[in-house]
From Swiss-Prot:
Descriptive protein name: Leucine--tRNA ligase
Transmembrane segments: none
Matches recorded under PANTHER family: LEUCINE--TRNA LIGASE, MITOCHONDRIAL (PTHR43740:SF2), LEUCYL-TRNA SYNTHETASE (PTHR43740)
Signal peptide range: none
Organism: Staphylococcus aureus (strain NCTC 8325 / PS 47)
Keywords: Aminoacyl-tRNA synthetase, ATP-binding, Cytoplasm, Ligase, Nucleotide-binding, Protein biosynthesis
Positions with a binding annotation for ATP: K580
Protein biosynthesis as UniProt keyword: yes
Localization in the cell: Cytoplasm
Domain of life: Bacteria
GO BP terms in the entry: leucyl-tRNA aminoacylation
One Pfam family from the record: tRNA-synt_1
Length: 805
């Protein structure tokens, strides 16, 4: 059996594409455009795994397909190369993260090139390249000038043993993931970006995007907009006020106590001497827990009384003020009014600590449980007898009259904590002067370079390792002689990935982020494919920066990514997640070696729908390779010449299946239905094997449809068909509607209602001809022998019924 040599063919065409810069994107600003984007990878030490190429193959198929349709296609690749793993490696080994990162990028790039993706490598970006992060810093300065970047005291995860601040992901059950050391919440000065200012726009503009609804919902929930009221409770015997946000101001007559977060600014000043020790001990315990642990619905409620009281602004009743860790300082105002009769969590708390439960909505039995349903208000003064909506409106009115509250919209979304106490990130371009002022680094001095250092180690104070580098930190103003200290925090890994899709449009521009004309031509991104794990943060942060740049008239669109698609996860053979510990990780290098890149690409697209989670299967991989071998054998003789089966005359036998194939593959490519497109290509090849001759233009059309999926074999077969130039820019095949249907139909012939024959006839056969054909059929003749024909009924294209006695 003759099979093709994938190693030889794939290397040959990859070299050809490289030498000829086949996929170089020109900036023909008048041509119709298509921008296909992959989520660029973090170049880890482990290299590419088989999950990466799934999304990359999908965008590559679309890019190749669109080029053949005459589009100007932008399809770039780059590296999201700052981040913790490289820093961790540097801390563990003493090596420079630059070296580590450079080596990893080389591996990733080699692996990606071996898969035959049609990237324009002249547009490659790397977030750790000073020429790139110059513009990341420039965007930060624009945010700062617009009042969207500010310094705030924020509680962070401080790990004294490691001498550093950890992200929430690095803390598990109150200890560090690495080494298992205790972690405490400690307030530190941090840079924060005011994403909340854009909350409404980020919410509203989701409606115009072609994104999966489930993903839009994740963003909506993360933003978490709710309407309600802000209510003030005066604290007895002090000037203090406790402000709460509630979506149910109508239940205020049932507010029988207040709960503050242990970190709330008022706690220490209102706590009475008698309760000070208990409160202090509780605060310390709470500082060891993550937000997730604190808000776990299943956990036992804990809390302590502060000894202080406040006054309910509508009922005038005195209410106790407690602290409890299930209230977070970061949500709302960091305080809640507890209405135990109508809220499950408050009910549990009130029962545990024997606090009053006042029913204000009828319909439940508050002796047994909180009632959270609808109903008429009772025990509520002027609100009595009103239903929910009317009562909410009235309650806000009453609060406003007393100056004790107002209507308010609240967001679950918090401002974005933007500093990291790390070395391997973009330096934040800010100087703190000794007179207490701060300024940004002048734009003409950007990029502010990350200093090279022999020793990356935690500062021990919670600051970043940059704090140890005096030559970086200390500055003197040349004009005034004033001393200053540079900001030592660095930006999070999200920063570089917030805008990389803009830099691809004009990656070598030294004077601006990108040329406005080019931005106008290429934006928005037409198709963005990546994993669902970035559904919230990366996409929300990128949308936020894009909206700021839109307001600054730097980008011409309100949204960056018009259509977004999440590929599914490729699981191990036993339907488990691939992981090093399970030893079920599959390295694409091995597959490329054994089966070829085209087989890997075809298989990953054929496994199932692009967004489904599917288990890897060696059998499936072998099946994909067998299909490519069948295609090869159909067209190529043992000696490598073109098969004589391929002819220049059309005997029409493949008209229907060819035209159906072009229609189906074209429609499926448009909807990313690659698995069903491949099935149809297989149907076509099966039909080709059943006939003696195959019409050459049909085979050429087939090769054009196969090439985006399996580009190396596509190019090789195209050249075997006698073409000198690459298949890349050949026009996409078209189909003829008229040939999608058969010229022939099958009719049934019945004698006295019993089936006697099935006969193929031309579609336009007349009734008379149908009768003649039926009566001359041997089976029919045998069954009417010796009988009189009473009548013959013919239904065109369907049946002939003969009644005989």
């Amino acid at each position: 059996m003759l099979n093709y040599n994938h190693n030889q063919i794939e290397k040959k065409w990859q070299d050809y594409w490289d030498e000829n810069k086949t996929f170089k994107t020109n900036d023909n600003l008048g041509q119709k455009k298509f921008y296909a984007l992959d989520m660029f990878p973090y170049p880890s030490g482990a290299g590419l795994h088989v999950g990466h190429p799934e999304g990359y193959t999908a965008t590559d198929i679309i890019s190749r397909y669109k080029r053949m349709q005459g589009y100007n296609v932008l399809h770039p690749m780059g590296w999201d190369a700052f981040g913790l793993p490289a820093e961790q490696y540097a801390l563990d080994t003493g090596n420079d993260p630059r070296e580590f990162t450079k080596k990893n990028i080389q591996t990733f790039k080699r692996q990606i090139k071996e898969l035959g993706f049609s990237y324009d490598w002249d547009r490659e970006v790397n977030t750790t390249d000073p020429e790139y992060y110059k513009w990341t810093q420039w965007i930060f300065i624009q945010l700062y000038n617009k009042g969207l970047a500010y310094v705030d005291e924020v509680a962070v995860n401080w790990c004294p043993a490691l001498g550093t601040v950890l992200s929430n992901e690095e803390v598990i059950d109150g200890v560090s993931e690495r080494g298992g050391h205790p972690v405490y919440r400690k307030p530190m000065k941090q840079w924060v970006l005011k994403i909340t200012e854009y909350a409404d726009q980020l919410l509203a503009d989701l409606d115009d995007l072609d994104w999966p609804e489930s993903l839009k919902d994740m963003q909506r929930n993360w933003i978490g907009r709710s309407e309600g009221a802000k209510v003030s409770f005066d604290v007895d015997n002090t000037e203090g006020k406790v402000e709460v946000f509630t979506t149910r101001p109508d239940t205020i007559y049932g507010a029988s106590f207040l709960v503050l977060s242990p970190e709330h600014a008022l706690v220490n000043s209102i706590t009475t001497d008698e309760y000070k020790e208990k409160v202090k001990a509780y605060q310390t315990e709470a500082s060891k827990k993550s937000d997730l642990e604190r808000t776990d619905l299943a956990k036992d409620k804990s809390g302590v009384f502060t000894g202080a009281y406040a006054t309910n602004p509508l009922s005038g009743e005195k209410v106790q003020i407690w602290i409890a860790d299930y209230v977070l300082s970061t949500y709302g105002t960091g305080a809640i009014m507890a209405v135990p009769a109508h809220d499950d969590r408050d009910y549990e708390f009130a029962k545990k600590f024997d606090l009053p439960i006042i029913e204000v909505i009828e319909g439940g039995n508050v002796e047994e449980a909180a009632y959270t349903g609808e109903g008429k208000h009772i025990n509520s003064g002027e609100l009595d007898g009103l239903e929910n909506e009317a009562a909410i409106t009235k309650a806000i009115q009453l609060l406003e009259q007393k100056g004790a509250g107002e209507k308010k919209v609240n967001y679950k979304l918090r401002d974005w904590l933007f500093s990291r106490q790390r070395y391997w990130g973009e330096p934040i371009p800010v100087i703190h002067w000794e007179d207490g002022t701060m300024t940004t680094v002048p734009e003409e001095e950007l990029p502010l370079l990350l200093p090279e250092t022999d020793e990356i180690k935690p500062s021990g104070t919670g600051e970043s390792p940059l704090a140890n580098i005096d030559s970086f930190v200390n500055v003197v103003d040349e004009k005034t002689g004033m001393k200053g200290r540079r900001e030592t925090n660095t930006m999070p890994q999200w920063a570089g990935s917030c805008w990389y899709y803009l830099r691809y449009i004009d990656p070598k521009n030294e004077n601006m982020l990108a040329d406005p004309e080019k931005l106008k031509h290429w934006l928005p991104v037409d198709l963005y494919i990546g994993g669902v794990e970035h559904a919230v943060l990366h996409l929300l942060y990128a949308r936020f920066w894009h909206k700021v740049l839109y307001d600054l008239a730097i980008v011409p669109t309100k949204e960056p990514f018009q259509k977004l698609f999440n590929q599914g996860m490729i699981l191990g053979e036993g339907n488990e997640k691939m992981s090093k510990s399970k030893g079920n990780v599959i390295n694409p290098d091995d597959i490329v070696q054994s089966h070829g890149a085209d087989t890997l690409r075809l298989y990953e697209m054929f496994m199932g729908p692009l967004d489904a989670a599917i288990a890897w299967s060696e059998k499936g991989l072998d099946g994909s390779r067998r299909f490519l071998d069948r295609v090869w054998r159909l067209m190529v003789n043992e000696d490598g010449t073109l098969s004589s089966k391929i002819v220049t005359t059309n005997n029409k036998s493949l008209d229907k299946v060819y035209n159906q194939t072009v229609k189906k593959v074209t429609e499926d490519f448009e909807t990313l239905g690659f698995n069903t497109a491949i099935s149809q290509l297989m149907v076509f090849i099966n039909e080709c094997y059943k006939v003696d001759e195959v019409y050459k233009p049909y085979i050429e059309g087939f090769v054009k449809m196969l090439a985006p999926i399996a580009p190396h074999i596509g190019e090789e077969l195209w050249s075997k068909l006698g073409h000198e130039e690459s298949i890349t820019y050949q026009p996409w095949p078209t189909y003829d509607e008229a040939l999608l249907v058969d010229d022939e139909v099958e009719i049934v012939v019945q004698v006295n209602g019993k089936l006697r024959a099935k006969i193929k006839i031309a579609k336009d056969t007349s009734k008379e001809e149908m009768q003649e054909i039926a009566l001359s059929n041997d089976n029919v003749k045998a069954s009417i022998e010796g009988k009189d024909i009473m009548k013959v009924i013919a239904v065109p294209q369907k049946l002939v019924n003969i009644v005989a006695k």
